[in-house]
Amino acid sequence: MYTAEEREQIIDIVDKMSLLRQDFDGAFTWIKENVAMPFDFDGEQQFISDLKQLVKINALKFGKIYEGVLN
């Protein structure tokens, strides 16, 4: 389980990778390799889903569409 500060740091990293660097695939890979909350599976899945949605929205701002971005 992440503290609120840790969650903000993770969101900031993902946001910077996907928005400032436009490294959308790298952001998805970073999420996959670095985000895990072993004692809160439902919370982990929701947090990961929210992070991926952030990347998809940032990609859309640059005209790149990932599947599921409009869901």
UniProtKB/Swiss-Prot annotation:
InterPro entries: Gp38-like. Changing residue 3 to I: In P008H2-10; confers partial resistance to bacterial AbiQ. Induction: Expressed early in the viral replication cycle (at protein level). Transcript is detected 2 minutes after infection, peaks at 10 minutes and is degraded to a smaller size by 20 minutes. Some smaller transcripts were detected in bacteria expressing AbiQ (AC Q9ZJ19). Disruption phenotype: Cannot be generated, suggesting it is essential for virus function. Changing residue 38 to L: In P008-Q12; confers partial resistance to bacterial AbiQ, altered expression profile of virus gene orf53, reduced virus burst size, longer lytic cycle, i.e. reduced fitness. Keywords: Early protein. Transmembrane segments: none annotated. Pfam families: Phage_gp38. Changing residue 49 to P: In P008-Q11; confers partial resistance to bacterial AbiQ. It comes from the Viruses. Involved in escape from killing mediated by the bacterial AbiQ protein upon infection of L.lactis subsp. lactis strain IL1403. 11 distinct mutations in the protein and 2 in the ribosome-binding site confer on the virus the ability to partially escape killing (i.e. the virus grows in the bacteria), in some cases probably by decreasing the protein level. This is Gene product 38.
